[in-house]
Amino acid sequence: MYNFIMYAMQLGVRIAARFDSKVRKMWRGEQAAFGVLQQRVDPSARYVWFHAASLGEFEQGRPLMEAIRREFPDYKILLTFFSPSGYEVRKDYKGADIVTYLPIDTVGNARRFLRTVRPVMAFFVKYEFWYNYLHILNHRGVPTYSVSSIFRPGQIFFRPYGRQYGRVLRCFSRFFVQNEESSLLLSSIGIDQVEVVGDTRFDRVLQVREVRKQLPLVERFVGDSHRVFVAGSSWLPDEELFLRYFASHPEWKLIIAPHVIKEEHLAQISQLLQGKKVARYTQSSEETVADADVLIIDCFGLLSSVYHYGRVAYVGGGFGVGIHNVLEAAVWGMPVLFGPNNKHFQEAQGLIAAQGGFEVSDDAGFAQLMDRFTKDEAFLQESAGRAAAFVEKLTGATERVLQAVKPELEKNCQAQS
């Protein structure tokens, strides 16, 4: 049944590629993947393979990737993506020797891929459970790890009808999971090669904080204002919520980095901002931005550094399929607000428990919270400190994973020499 689904998926992608530019990029990338590998794989090298579905998973795997590269430079790194949103942004990533798409998980593709690369170790980040790739890796005795994975009772592996597919989990040498609940769930189906290490994203946001970009244009916009609200990865429902409040609160400067940067959406934001002076990052100079009330970040790659300039952050997605990365904001020591769809996001729940994060579901709740931040500086600073402390406390997952896999990496080095 699984293989039938994979072949149907392959056919579906081929058909959808005719009508959807994003799917077309994925299809072409997968078709080109074997050519890339044939040209670039060094037959004498030993490859450690990292697979990430998209950009978020890449950021989770990145600290470990870079730690292995730093401590074991003799290994080469292969990085694969499933989604164009990951590959297109990171196809030139210098921390990997080869970056490409992962061909769809058919038996033929998996055999050909692994025969070409011959990895000595493999890491799948978070939710990646491709049966054919994993089965062949296991059959070949390749140490294979699931990193920053998290499991919930409703997943197919833990339902009676999903036990057969759950066998894919036995192909992993070890799971490095985010929490104790995940460990207990795996144990309930007889999988005990599990270590609770936490989430490598905490390590990643600390790394980003240390090498933040200097943004003179944003600094000029902020000036000497002590009330700067930064909205990151926002969608229209998020923007409608907070812009209704700020329409009558001119004491706050706004920086908006929308998740979708298309002219149609930017026009919607501008429509909501009638009466305010609006500047777009790519169209402004330090002179023109100084008098603006709102700065729209209309390009990618700046958000993690932009948060540095805020006093209060809002992370979008909570009125849709789910919130985006709250840790990118929290690491800068500021209270983080987000919408109600956050229950399956452990980091958001932890931030709420630490009193550094706040769920808002309507205009009244948002206004009440922002009014308090405006009038009570002590409350704002206390919330900010708790957000930063929450992130600092939960770092270290990367080092724990590295120490666990280091003996295997050292053994491979000795075998080669």
Ranges and model annotations:
Residues 1-417:
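Nucleotide-activated sugar donor-binding and catalytic core shared by glycosyltransferases
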